[in-house]
Amino acid sequence: MGRSTKGNGMSERIGVDYSELHRLDSPANRLIRESIWSRSDDIGQQSFATLGYFDEIIHRLGIAPHHRVLDIGSGTGGPGIYIAEKSGCRLVGVEVNEVGVEVSRGLVEGSGVGDRVEFLLGDAMQLPFDDASFDIAFSMNVMNVFEDKVALFREVLRVLTPGGRWAFLSGTFELGPDDADVRARLTPGYLIPQFYDSVDGYKAKLREAGFVVDEILEYISDFRVQVSRWGNAYSTHRDEIAKEQGEENTAYHIDYFAAYLEMVDAGKAANDLIISHRPG
């Protein structure tokens, strides 16, 4: 992710830019990732998603070699490359952050799938593709940065073939008027402004955009583990992270993960895989 203008779901930079997190080999990022992932599980993902999530997407969507697949908000490319390797599909990743695209292209060069995977710098609100260009689209934990989700979903619908499937993994929140303090603690921990939504909110917006909602899968146990690991990583390596991201942002993130964990335990936050399709 990165920086853009209000109206396409982004905003000007707040705190550290995603560029810092996209530099996977920086000293702080190496420490963070070693605290969260085992060597075999670290494919460059920058969310709470484990390899099991990606395997589930391949299985649930039936991704196969003949499919053309779009990865929206592809980050540093690891998940897209993993899915292409496991399924044999052709895949295009779109990412708005230049560093993310640069890292993605470096990873794909040594992956063995360079003939059927590419990563482009682009805006998901204005996808640089013709209508009906893809059979499947997916996104991993980036829906929260888009303010106008209906417009985003309509753009995804446009580039999907009739019957094409759209799946995204997203943190969902059920925050009420009594959760103002938690909301205030969550907001600074994000790198850019957040636009929370609930499962019901996502379902309504998908239908408004023209999708048919197929199924929603909620992840709790391993999601809680991942939130806890991210928080522990920031707390354990606070000094090293602060050298790269600044003391204030590091402190914000430590409190953010603590608040997030409280919401998970209270049943007010989850990670949901939401699957829908374009009619036709």
Regions from the PLM with identified roles:
Residues M1-S38:
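N-terminal, positively charged/glycine-rich alpha-helical extensions of SAM-dependent methyltransferases
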Residues I136-D148:
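A short SAM/SAH-binding and catalytic strip from SAM-dependent methyltransferases
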